């Protein structure tokens, strides 16, 4: 029988005997337990015995997320674009499309842990000593949450099932103590004997979302409690979309627009499949006067583009913040990139459809000077119209949205490409290699399916049937990729489709862009708070080589976590002389018959939920000027049976 099945049987027996008096759960351990004793000791699943109280001060303390007040002004349409002719972007409308949960502050515990209360210590000990628990077979631990009413302020009792040893553990709260009292001598005295091995992890808080963990092992009788020379260093940073700052907000807004366009395309095709007849929805624009738009389109297509595509000066290195700022106002050189800035401002689907008609009329009648260089479907249509090789397209259904999505994905990728290459954080090849499976043959006019795949899209290996035949946009028979979800009618092979949309492919591309953006956020925070210029290339490479997590929607709560290893000498000067924010120290001693383990946990904040923490008396930290810690001690004794 598996270990989980054995522990589940113990849980069932405890429920039968004690379920009426106490709340008993079988699942993941509480977050505070994992922090105090360590993830390895806590395990993935435990049986936890406690009392549940859903009354009290939870709501008053506002420790859980609360829904933000709904926005009352304006239209229901989403406006993330602003006008291309004036700076009037209103980003507050983001809340209209997401569940906006405002966190008063981030809590280290879960919501359900706020309702947990301890049971009397003597009651917990009586269950531990009961015959049925002593004779039960299992693997894993039963933990009893206590009320701290005893002299030692016991918080948790542990009964561990072990086939060869008797194993017990006790976790108690030690109050608040100044940092200068945390010494090797004091810890060894608490441990009771000279440790054979000591594992130490110091955590330094750089900002509320960034921490540096320094860890090492020592066999000394009095181990060093601070070691910045040969420790293992891990940098952890959490980026939450809702915390996106003004420097990168514009790029995140563009990414959100692309996500919403994709959602509306998928929704439209789903309704069509179900027999619902309606026009698609476009909800991302601020609105623009159509006469202004016509004039802007004509000017964009007939003006000569600038020749400046890069700001690089030989091997000069630029400050990453400065590069991001310049990327926001960089000169766009490709026609479809400029058209993205115009077309995304349309107020509705109807306006967007009219805008494309004006665009096609201009392409067919005007002398286009600014020939598109991008390899997307819209660029090909404009080129063929200008060369009189294509009849005037009449867009219908989701085609305007699909064309807009494709040029938007390509333009935003170029923004990120500019940032990464100009700041010398990585080469274009790295972005290519990680966002596309192979290099593309951009110059082949016969390889039309490749035209809709921009630099960052994963390339399929399917050959195009009849690749040797001469193909034009009027006579194109595309191969259907059975591995993807494409939306096309029964006449998909009857002629050229004005646009292309692949649900899975679009998800992959948006997910890659989100990964690139999150990497940028992580690097910016490293630059602002640590200024570790020498590690940016390695960090960038490590993060971008990871498979991106699939992102189908973006709201303020979406987050990304970076956890990377650094060399100690990079952070030594930054951390020298500073007290850790938290400390986790484990001492072990053992002989042939017995093993003693003592874990000390110190944290600048009380990591227990308020109603649980108030059961333990502590001094007022506000009255102490120097660094102080809430402290816990965990003793575990394992004896041979």
From Swiss-Prot:
Has the keyword Nucleotidyltransferase been applied to this entry? no
GO biological process assignments? cell division; mitotic spindle assembly checkpoint signaling; protein localization to kinetochore
The reply to whether Oxidoreductase figures as a keyword in the UniProt entry is no
Name the gene for this chain. Zwilch
Q: Where in the cell is it found?
A: Cytoplasm; Chromosome, Centromere, Kinetochore; Cytoplasm, Cytoskeleton, Spindle
Provide the function of this protein.
Essential component of the mitotic checkpoint, which prevents cells from prematurely exiting mitosis. Required for the assembly of the dynein-dynactin, Mad2 complexes and spindly/CG15415 onto kinetochores. Its function related to the spindle assembly machinery is proposed to depend on its association in the RZZ complex. Failure to assemble the complex due to the absence of any one of its components, results in the incorrect redistribution of the remaining components to diverse membrane compartments.
How would you summarize the oligomeric state and partners of this protein?
Component of the RZZ complex composed of rod, Zw10 and Zwilch.
Q: Please identify the protein, giving its name as recorded.
A: Protein zwilch
InterPro entries attached here?
Zwilch
UniProt organism field: Drosophila melanogaster (Fruit fly)
**Record's family?**
Belongs to the ZWILCH family.
């Amino acid at each position: 029988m598996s270990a989980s099945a054995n522990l589940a049987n113990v849980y069932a027996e405890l429920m039968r005997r004690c379920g009426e008096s106490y709340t008993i759960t079988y699942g993941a351990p509480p977050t505070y337990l994992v922090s105090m004793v360590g993830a390895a000791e806590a395990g993935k699943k435990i049986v936890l015995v406690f009392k549940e109280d859903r009354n009290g001060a939870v709501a008053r303390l506002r420790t859980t997320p609360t829904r933000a007040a709904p926005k009352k002004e304006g239209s229901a349409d989403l406006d993330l674009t602003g006008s291309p002719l004036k700076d009037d972007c209103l980003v507050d409308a983001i809340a209209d499309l997401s569940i906006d949960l405002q966190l008063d502050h981030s809590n280290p515990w879960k919501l359900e842990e706020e309702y947990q209360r301890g049971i009397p210590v003597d009651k917990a000990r009586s269950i531990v000593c009961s015959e049925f628990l002593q004779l039960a077979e299992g693997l894993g631990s039963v933990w009893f949450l206590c009320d701290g009413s005893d002299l030692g302020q016991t918080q948790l009792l542990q009964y561990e099932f072990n086939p060869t040893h008797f194993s017990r553990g006790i976790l108690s709260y030690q109050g608040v103590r100044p940092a200068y009292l945390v010494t090797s001598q004091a810890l060894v005295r608490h441990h009771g004997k000279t440790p054979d091995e000591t594992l130490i992890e110091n955590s330094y808080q750089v900002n509320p979302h960034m921490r540096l963990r320094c860890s090492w092992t020592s066999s000394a009788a009095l181990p060093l409690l601070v070691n910045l020379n040969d420790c293992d260093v891990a940098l952890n940073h959490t980026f939450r979309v809702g915390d996106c700052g003004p420097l990168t907000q514009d790029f995140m807004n563009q990414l959100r627009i692309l996500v919403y366009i994709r959602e509306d395309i998928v929704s439209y095709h789903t309704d069509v499949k179900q027999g619902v007849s309606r026009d698609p929805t476009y909800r991302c624009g601020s609105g623009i006067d159509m006469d202004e738009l016509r004039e802007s389109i004509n000017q964009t297509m007939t003006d000569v583009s600038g020749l400046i595509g890069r700001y690089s000066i030989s091997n000069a290195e630029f400050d990453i913040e400065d590069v991001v700022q310049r990327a926001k106002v960089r000169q766009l050189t490709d026609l479809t990139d400029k058209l993205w800035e115009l077309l995304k401002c349309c107020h509705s689907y109807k306006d967007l459809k009219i805008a494309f008609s004006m665009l096609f009329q201009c392409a067919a009648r005007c002398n286009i000077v600014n020939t598109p260089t991008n390899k997307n479907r819209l660029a090909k249509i404009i080129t063929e119209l200008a060369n009189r090789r294509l009849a005037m397209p009449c867009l219908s259904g989701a085609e305007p949205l699909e064309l807009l999505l494709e040029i938007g994905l390509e333009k935003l990728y170029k923004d990120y490409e500019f940032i990464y290459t100009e700041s010398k954080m990585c080469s274009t090849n790295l972005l290519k290699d990680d966002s596309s499976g192979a290099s593309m043959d951009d110059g082949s006019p016969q390889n039309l399916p490749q035209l809709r795949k921009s630099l960052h899209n994963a390339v399929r290996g399917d050959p195009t049937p009849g690749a040797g035949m001469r193909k034009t946009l009027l006579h194109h028979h595309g191969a259907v990729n059975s591995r993807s979800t494409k939306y096309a009618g029964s006449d998909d092979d009857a002629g050229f489709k004005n646009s292309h949309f692949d649900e899975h492919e679009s998800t992959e591309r948006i997910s890659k862009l989100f990964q690139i953006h999150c990497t940028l956020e992580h690097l910016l925070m490293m630059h602002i708070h640590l200024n570790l210029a020498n590690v940016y290339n390695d960090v960038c490479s490590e993060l971008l080589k990871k498979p991106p997590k699939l992102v189908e929607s973006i709201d303020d709560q979406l987050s990304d976590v970076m956890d990377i290893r650094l060399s100690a000498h990079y952070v030594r000067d930054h951390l020298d002389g500073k007290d850790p924010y938290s400390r986790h120290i484990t001492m072990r001693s053992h002989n042939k018959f017995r093993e003693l383990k003592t874990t000390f946990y110190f944290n600048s904040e009380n990591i227990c939920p308020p109603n649980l923490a108030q059961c333990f008396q502590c001094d007022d930290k506000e009255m102490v000027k120097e660094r102080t810690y809430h402290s816990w001690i965990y003793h575990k004794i394992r004896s041979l049976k």
